[in-house]
């Protein structure tokens, strides 16, 4: 996702941090090339500082150093790497290069502007639930992120076992808003394991992330799909400590897991709760897919799509061609973005002083 233009002060901060990291890396000697074998392809399944866990084609995982020339490497990156020669290198391998990404998930970062956190994702599973509450506003936020990334979204409503007939009818009406504009919706229960087979099929052949507000059961759902009988947070430490003994670093590091039925998932707290703060208003507008046919049809080129005279989108809402709740959420998102961006600017200014 693209970012807002940084102020000169922010640009200086980003540049200074990058230069500092380059100097730190330059102070450390590169490993001897003779200690490593032939170059091969792999996937970065997690990263810890200047090391990455790289999975080879045979499924084996290798803790690798990262060349200083590599500016950015995140979970999901396809890489070129070399294994350590047995009895020679003190590390299992070294990452030489990163292949071009098909997509990259980012989040705002106070020091570096925008920070990549996962790469090559092709599906965002947007998880919601009737508890703590069904929030269409949050669903719409994640849909905007998906559309901006050009990554296919999948809407999953969890905890459906808690619905009575009346509640199920209400929820189905709400979900019809999204089905009507072309989104796929699945109703599941991780507790009762209902609807999981259909969800498993939707994950095959995909690199997915699971996103949604706290309390909707993302971790429980992932554990059920991965075949784990673990607590909500233990997914973030399983396998990493088994592979490298570095489980203490995994609570914030994104990691790629394989579903037993096929498909992959990249998971971490940062991945689950990425935001929209670094988007432009025009990107938010285009992120509402049903608005697109009306863009360019407004009377004024700088139309805010609110109370402006001759607004084609507003007229479509009045005619029932665009759902009114989506239109309201669109403006809520714009307002909240403005508030967050203003707060961020104040933080930068205060820090500068």
Curated annotation (Swiss-Prot):
Listed Polar residues bias regions: 1-14
MF (Gene Ontology): GTP binding; GTPase activity; metal ion binding; rRNA binding
BP-aspect Gene Ontology terms: ribosomal small subunit biogenesis
Top-rank taxon: Bacteria
Sites where the protein binds Zn(2+): 298, 303, 305, 311
EC number: 3.6.1.-
PROSITE patterns associated with the record: ENGC_GTPASE (PS50936), G_CP (PS51721)
Cofactor binding summary note: Binds 1 zinc ion per subunit.
Domain spans labelled CP-type G: 102-274
GO cellular component: cytoplasm
Keyword annotations of the record: Cytoplasm, GTP-binding, Hydrolase, Metal-binding, Nucleotide-binding, Ribosome biogenesis, RNA-binding, rRNA-binding, Zinc
Chain positions covered by the region annotation Disordered: 1-36
InterPro entries: G_CP_dom, NA-bd_OB-fold, P-loop_NTPase, Ribosome_biogen_GTPase_RsgA, RsgA_GTPase_dom
Keyword match RNA-binding: yes
Compositional bias of kind Basic and acidic residues: 16-31
Pfam families, sorted: RsgA_GTPase
Keyword GTP-binding: yes
Subcellular location: Cytoplasm
Positions that bind GTP: 158-161, 212-220
Family per record: Belongs to the TRAFAC class YlqF/YawG GTPase family. RsgA subfamily.
Subunit structure: Monomer. Associates with 30S ribosomal subunit, binds 16S rRNA.
Protein name (record): Small ribosomal subunit biogenesis GTPase RsgA
Source organism (scientific name): Erwinia tasmaniensis (strain DSM 17950 / CFBP 7177 / CIP 109463 / NCPPB 4357 / Et1/99)
Primary gene name: rsgA
